[in-house]
A protein has these predicted regions:
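General small-molecule cofactor/ligand-binding pocket signal
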Residues: 9, 83-85, 99
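Short, glycine-/Ser/Thr-/acidic-enriched flexible segments
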Residues: 38-39, 63-64, 91, 103-105, ...
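Short amphipathic alpha-helical segments
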Residues: 1-3, 44-46, 70-71, 142-146
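Rossmann-like NAD(P)H-binding beta-loop-alpha module
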Residues: 22-53
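Short, hinge-like loop/turn segments at secondary-structure boundaries
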Residues: 5, 73-76, 102
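Rossmann-like dinucleotide-binding cores of NAD(P)H-dependent redox enzymes
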Residues: 16, 44-92
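A conserved short coil-to-beta-strand element within the FAD-binding core of flavoproteins
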Residues: 87-97, 102-107
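FAD-site-proximal beta/loop scaffold in flavoenzymes
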Residues: 6-28, 108-169
Length: 169
């Protein structure tokens, strides 16, 4: 994710640091996570538990209804107190604020989700740290190349009792 100004932290790098420091990553009081998938939910929930963090906002350009995250992940983030800032597209980070452009829902796209259309409205969110959790993909091609059956989301198919994949041995 590129902003006009300011830097973001990568979600997977944050999660690794969170684990390595037992939740003591230096993030400041206000954290903003950008994204709407499972990685964004995990990142927001971890940030909420991180030492010194008071508020975690999750920014997404559509509404919760169109987030690709599993419903269970979304519910857990809500239960943990993550605040959702819907219909916002991040533009830049400056002076401790993430500047976002307000969006509105448009027509349905090929994936069945509503597209978004920019408006002229600007929204500012307090942000000491911005973590980008966009574009994280499960390496489905790797699984398939190694003979592991995958589901429609390119996740390995496993036996629910043994957690074995389709590969013998």
């Amino acid at each position: 994710l590129r902003l006009e100004a300011g830097e973001t932290m990568n979600a997977l790098e944050f999660l690794a640091q969170f684990k390595a420091t037992d939740g003591k990553v230096d993030l400041g009081k206000n954290v903003v996570v950008i994204g709407g998938g499972n990685t964004a939910m995990d990142t927001a929930r971890a940030a909420k538990r991180n030492a010194g963090v008071e508020k975690v906002s999750l920014v997404y350009r559509r509404t919760k209804r169109y987030m690709p995250a599993d419903e269970e992940e979304l519910v857990m983030a809500i239960d943990d107190g993550v605040e959702f800032a819907e219909l916002l597209a991040p533009v830049k980070l400056e002076n401790g604020e993430l500047i976002c452009r307000k969006m509105q829902l448009g027509d349905y796209d090929a994936s069945g989700r509503r597209g978004v259309v920019e408006t002229e409205e600007i929204v500012k969110i307090a942000a000491d740290t911005v973590i980008a959790a966009v574009g994280e993909k499960v390496p489905g091609a790797f699984y398939e190349a190694n003979g592991i059956a995958v589901d429609e989301k390119k996740r390995p198919v496993v036996d629910h009792n043994t957690l074995e994949t389709s590969v013998k041995g």
